[in-house]
Amino acid sequence: MVLFLAGSVNPNALEIAAGFALWATLLSWFSRPDPELDRARSIRAAIAATALVMSRSLSPAFLVLIVGGSLLVLERGAARRVWRAGRIAAIVVGAMTIAALAWTVGVGSLDTPGVSEPEYESIKRYVVAMLLSVSDFERQMIGVFGWLDTSAEPHVYNLWFTMIGFLVVSALAVGAGRERLLLVGLLALSVVFPLVVQYPVAPRLGLIWQGRYLLPLMVGLPLAAGWVLASKERWNELMSSRWAFWIPVGTLAAMRCQRASDRRASAESASPVDSARIPPGESRANASATSASGSTECSR
């Protein structure tokens, strides 16, 4: 998805790449401060954060969340040393953030017209509509192209979701308390953030949210999960054992099962029986017979 956005000259691509770079830099820096590397890390973090915050109007919020999430893994007793190494970078990024916010407010990029979607003034209706769209947002993070009219093959999404799910569940199993809090927090934000951010404009613009908007933050989920696993001795021992072979085998088997389920569902969705209303208590076989007899009568 990032490559597609970059090819279409979309600032979202730069924003996502900068978010990934900032996550990677801060996680390695905060978890293992090293006096010999702290200065270089602060420079990399400043460059990534500046590129992020200057990309789009939501970018300052992502900056705050990425820094806050990374602070959860800050090594105990390292706060002062990290601050000494990064205070100049923090000042520079703070100035860039203020400039970005001033530009956003000054040009009125967040201004919207009058109410055109009054049904979303109801919080209940809005929340239900957004929750029903969560699966669409997830697929859009992986890749839905064009004007949201070109999807990848189903097995592409199945493979991505299987791999990311495997990473996250494994990291939750072996991670420490603050590491688990980071992962659970990111999972929660994947649902809560769009709900909160879009609500003020939904009555005027409708449901305009796309999954890619959240990618600068959510690229941190597989990255953080992989970082947690790589830092655990138990996990490294498992990966070096004979059992490691069965992990991708099991993952591919699960993906294959999901693919078979998708094929069955897509075949059924084309069936005239599925499009017909099946009364309560009536079996599918009876519905098929009723549908067939109706078709015969219409052809006479």
Give the location of each predicted region:
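Membrane-interface alpha helices of multi-pass inner-membrane proteins
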Residues: 41-57, 62-68
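Perimembrane helix-loop-helix junctions
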Residues: 28-31, 39, 62-95
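Specific aromatic-rich, kink-prone transmembrane helix
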Residues: 16-33, 220-224
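Short acidic/glycine- and proline-prone juxtamembrane loop motifs at membrane-interface regions
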Residues: 8-15
